[in-house]
Amino acid sequence: MHRILFSMSVILYFSSGICAQETVFYQDVALINGISEGLPKGSIDKILIVDNAPMATSSSGQFEWRNSKWISNNKKGSPTTLPNFKGIPKEAGKVLSTIHYRNTTYVGCENGLYKKLDNNKWKQELPYDINYSWALKEVAALTVDSKDRLWFGAKQGIGRLEKGEWKLFTGREGVPYNHFTCASPGSKGMVWFGTENGAFRVDDNVFFYRANRRWLPDNHVNAIAIDSCGTAWIATRNGLAKIVSQEMTYTEKAAYFTKQVEERHNRMGFICQNDLKEQFNINTNQLAISDNDGEYTAMYGAAQAFRYAITKDPEARELANRSFYALKWLVDITHEPGFPARVIIPVDWHEPVNEQYSREYNSRNQKNDPFWKDIFPRFPLSEDGNYRWKCDTSSDELAGHYFYYGIYHDLVAETKEEREAVKQVVADITDHLIRHGFKLVDYDGKPTRWGSFDPDYFNSIWGWDQRGLNAMMMLSFLNVASHVTGDTKYEEVAEKLREEENYDIYAMHAKEFFPPENAVPWDNNLGLMSLYGLINYEKNPERQIMYRIALENAWLHISKQKNAFWDGLYGAMAGFFTQKVDEGFFKPEELFVENPLFAKACIDRYYESSLDNRYMTETLQRIPLDLIGYDMDNTHRLDILLDPTPGQAKGMGWGNDTYALPIDERGHVRLDRDATVLHDNEGNGYAEHEGTFYLLPYYLAAYHKLIKQ
């Protein structure tokens, strides 16, 4: 966490020079305080702001925050006790909280909220509004905000009293949890609530839930204090969290993540997650490999290519070029031209990869996947003996390669050498696929597990469900090849697949939606990234309409995921179609002549994009700076709806607005994950993920003018 704080301080130093026209948003950052910061082990029972400095209390005494450390003041902490109130009815039960509001004392009890009258008499408050009427239970939190409004937290939810009228909130309105422990006001009417399972901030009727290790050292919150800068100091049963909310711009956030990738995620030009030797400690990071180094490097390269197209920054061009040549190396190192490796590592790599991916490993996997490929070694030696490369390459890798090659060719490749290099590698891969009957063929002479794009595969028991996606991908690869190389043979091959094998018809259903086990989230990446090349380079107006239908079919299923990358890809391609219509590209009366009404109906229907970019904006702004993979459990929340789809796995759902929960409240730190998974774990604190998670959707959206900069 210290590294994140340091980087944030650099960003905040430069934020004073933000240009007036740049969009500014608030970025939350959590710093976990424990033994290394001077606090005792265990529970922090109280936190107060004294002379605008935090003071924490535990069973070991009091500790003051001085010069970024907790220092004991050698005073013993006193237990928190509530005063005795005379006259409170016995049926009210135990007093749990109290506040003085407008010259009146209010107490929260086990069985109600009470207001003191004259002569030690008490009146029970029964809050109501247009939606609810409550006899409150377990009123454990009371506070008054900076706008002089009374707030409570109770079993039923939370309430706010303003000018004599109540406004009540439950899970339907956004309250995430209701076993309250405390409340504390901030500035501009903002209020924090602590619960037995996390904390949340209410800001202008918007709820921000802060729970799990990304935000808190322990979910049981004992106390909260807000300082004059708006920083929340949250005391828990296992340490303290400091949550800072600071102004930031998109470009500052991009600079932060580019620095993060370059410092901790660059392995010989390949980009992926890293490993943490010590849980949650990014200072113990170690370079790692993934199954899809090529795809992830391509995505980082695409981010830098879009950045270069926007800014002409030489650094962006350098990083985009480095990514391209890393991808080309993956293709050049293998057993025959055009077969891309998944991964390249030096022979002295710190993990015994072939022992890990042994024959026994293959046998175990075949029990769950009968079509798992039994190949050994999975990391053969390079010809020069200096490297190992991972085989059994999948369609994921191809999707990443082709996605980037088109973008690189169009936006970055300026010299003859660069243009010839991208032309050659695209030709090599595409020729390999054609030569082997539209299959990726490994060094054993057999197709890889996920590398078949041929008609026989589509019409088989093991490939029928991949038909739409893989047919569309193959047509996309051929479109990219035709565009980049200028060779007409690739269009001729594509025409044969369309006319003789109906690949263009299959492509209209480019993604499986049901049963749920077939709707895997990474297929959304493969589908949308491949559609990007297919649509951008398609010259035939009838097929443009067909592929626009395919895009909408693929998009609607994931349109509520709050995935800024998928939103951006859809928005870019839908905008491309709109532009084509405006340019007069389509002559409806000449298209689909068997039914001359069809083309116009499709153009009218799909002319406007269905993207609501509010959710893309929300996600880009709320992507956390901390991309450690945490165990994030949201199954207990009051503001969720479980997915009732037949055959759906347990623990799937979304917010009560029917959209995925906000990005910083779920364990979603990769671009190809399902945002409706309510309990997610991406490494359990032993991996940090690369900043491509922000960089690619941001620069893609900026390049295609989908967000306000």
Put a short name on every predicted segment:
Residues 21-54, 59-70:
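An edge-strand/N-cap motif at the start of beta-rich repeat modules
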Residues 31-50, 74-101, 126-147, 170-188, ...:
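Short coil-to-beta transitions that initiate beta-strands within beta-rich domains
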Residues 53-56, 104-107, 149-152, 190-193, ...:
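Conserved beta-propeller blade signature
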Residues 154, 195, 236, 292-308, ...:
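Well-ordered alpha-helical segments within folded domains of soluble proteins
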Residues 222-248:
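Blade-level signature of beta-propeller repeat domains, shared across WD40, Kelch, NHL, RCC1
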Residues 238, 243-264, 527-709:
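Terminal, non-catalytic domain-edge segments
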Residues 252-279, 320-335, 424-442, 489-510, ...:
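Long, well-ordered core segments of solenoidal/helical folds
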Residues 274-276, 280, 318-466:
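Extended ligand-binding groove/face enriched in aromatic
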